[in-house]
Amino acid sequence: MESFAYILILAFSIGTLFFAIALRDPPKIGK
């Protein structure tokens, strides 16, 4: 079960990093 927790934390960190980048640099796809 430790692997599941590790994957969950890894996915959360990646999601947070992606969210921070999205906030810092607004997506230009809609324009």
Curated annotation (Swiss-Prot):
The keyword Transmembrane helix applies. Keywords: Membrane, Photosynthesis, Photosystem II, Thylakoid, Transmembrane, Transmembrane helix. HAMAP family: PSII_PsbT (MF_00808). It is found in: Cellular thylakoid membrane. Its main location: membrane. PSII is composed of 1 copy each of membrane proteins PsbA, PsbB, PsbC, PsbD, PsbE, PsbF, PsbH, PsbI, PsbJ, PsbK, PsbL, PsbM, PsbT, PsbX, PsbY, PsbZ, Psb30/Ycf12, peripheral proteins PsbO, CyanoQ (PsbQ), PsbU, PsbV and a large number of cofactors. It forms dimeric complexes. It comes from Synechococcus sp. (strain RCC307). This is Photosystem II reaction center protein T. InterPro entries: PSII_PsbT, PSII_PsbT_sf. The chain crosses the membrane at residues 3-23. It is a single-pass membrane protein. Found at the monomer-monomer interface of the photosystem II (PS II) dimer, plays a role in assembly and dimerization of PSII. PSII is a light-driven water plastoquinone oxidoreductase, using light energy to abstract electrons from H(2)O, generating a proton gradient subsequently used for ATP formation. GO terms for cellular component: photosystem II reaction center; plasma membrane-derived thylakoid membrane. GO terms for biological process: photosynthesis. Belongs to the PsbT family. SUPFAM superfamilies: Photosystem II reaction center protein T, PsbT.
